[in-house]
Amino acid sequence: MADDSIVGAWELVSDSRVGVSIYTDSHFSTVMAAKNRQRSSGERATPDEALEALLTCQAVSGTYAVSGSTGTYTKVANTRAETSDQPIVGNHTINGDTMTFNIRSGGSSTNAGASLTWSRVPSVGTDTPLIGAWELVDD
């Protein structure tokens, strides 16, 4: 079971990117994108615009475990097929409602050494049936 202090929703604190990361006690889902992403020039994106949209919006989900300050993330689904077999490993620091994650390995070679700062999203209550984690299953 993961460290309960990480469970919840977090927003990326960054001048250049936006992002949301959601943690349950065993799973995570993260989406990040550049703040200055180009919109398509028309109602429908051109092939080049569609590729650029995909490359500038990173999405990853899977399972994770925290041991001490080390977080290890195993990807179940992500937008970077070339990194699918690489777990993400890094150091977590949580101070109040701020979490910092320093990537040691995994992700892509350009992410090693990167530091991400997240701010906890306040809870708004539990009076909706949608609260929780949902896994897509085939019929």
Language-model features: locations:
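Lipid interaction determinants
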Residues: 1-139
